[in-house]
Amino acid sequence: MSMGTPHAVMVMGLPASGKSTITKSFADRGYLVLNRDAAGGRVRDLVDPFKRRLLAGRDVVLDNTFVTLEHRAPFTEAARKLGVPLECHWMQTSFEDCSVNACGRMFERYRWVFMTASDIKDHPEASEDPNIFPIAVLFAMKKKLEGVKKKGVWEVPCGKPTMDEGFSRIVKFAEPA
């Protein structure tokens, strides 16, 4: 628990980029973890628990993809209104490494190297596992994070985090060498 002002961290990045590994290091230091995968529901459903924990003086770490400004905004706004600094820890693991990590996770848990959406749906355990997803999900998330420009116009706005959103700092985690 914090002495004085609580501290908040948002860990973001593509699926299978290592967010939960970084989040665990905060949990080990006493931060309360909020994660949509564990809580179920939608990202916006975490806003009220986030506020309550900060109001109680607790340090909080948010663990989710947060690849769009729209998903981050309710949390940056809540932290700003409560006067709590919110750091963004951005996992910049490459798309290729995230793909390898996701396939490795599928194999480790279910002995499948690659699962399609229908394979996952039909598998009794994988269908209930929020950390198992078709690779198409990675493509969609990458598109949201990087944005898509056609003829100089953003067709899909860039979702990369900026200091203008209200973060106290942005820490970029490069992929391992």
Task: Go through each PLM region and give its residues.
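Short glycine-/polar-rich loops that comprise or flank the Walker A/P-loop
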Residues: 56, 82-87, 149-154
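Conserved GTP-binding G-domain of TRAFAC-class P-loop NTPases and closely related GTPase folds
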Residues: 2-12, 17, 25, 29, ...
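Conserved substrate/cofactor phosphate-moiety recognition/catalytic segment
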Residues: 9-12, 17-71
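Residue-level detector of anion-binding/catalytic polar loops
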Residues: 32, 59, 85, 104, ...
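Short amphipathic alpha-helical segments and helix-helix/interface helices
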Residues: 23, 50-51, 76, 142-146
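Amphipathic helical hotspot of TIR/SEFIR-family domains
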Residues: 69-87
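Hydrophobic helix-cap positions at the C-terminus of alpha-helices
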Residues: 26, 53, 78-82, 148
